[in-house]
Amino acid sequence: MTKSELVAQLASRFPQLVLKDADFAVKTMLDAMSDALAKGHRIEIRGFGSFGLNRRPARVGRNPKSGEKVQVPEKFVPHFKPGKELRERVDGRAGEPLKADDPDDER
């Protein structure tokens, strides 16, 4: 699902929202989440999951072209951990073949 598909689905579920307002709501939520992660905060959405940061320590890597050693600095990367309800809902679909996203699929 893309951001524009999420906006369209939000607007269709709440008819009082015009597409512009749904787009603003999604952008505002994503901006708030991005800002929180950039400040080092953890985001928890009960029943869905949590977003946090994982630390990748500094290490010595290799330049694939020249083979020379390169110092790779420490960095933090966003990480999502699904909640129990989401894991169980997804696990209920185990064994089903993967398919292209269908916006009409409400499962």
UniProtKB/Swiss-Prot annotation:
SMART domains (alphabetical): BHL
Q: Keywords assigned by UniProt?
A: DNA recombination, DNA-binding, Transcription, Transcription regulation, Translation regulation
- PANTHER family, alphabetically? DNA-BINDING PROTEIN HU, INTEGRATION HOST FACTOR SUBUNIT BETA
Provide the function of this protein.
Answer: This protein is one of the two subunits of integration host factor, a specific DNA-binding protein that functions in genetic recombination as well as in transcriptional and translational control.
What GO terms are given for molecular function?
A: DNA binding; structural constituent of chromatin
Skewed-composition ranges (Basic and acidic residues): 82-101
Query: Can you name a GO cellular component term?
Result: cytosol
* Highest rank taxon of the organism: Bacteria
Q: Name any Gene Ontology BP term.
A: DNA recombination
Please report which protein family the annotation says this sequence is part of: Belongs to the bacterial histone-like protein family.
Q: What is this protein called?
A: Integration host factor subunit beta
> What residue spans carry the region label Disordered?
76-107
Q: Which Pfam families match?
A: Bac_DNA_binding
Task: Point out the gene that encodes the protein.
Answer: ihfB
Self-association and partners: Heterodimer of an alpha and a beta chain.
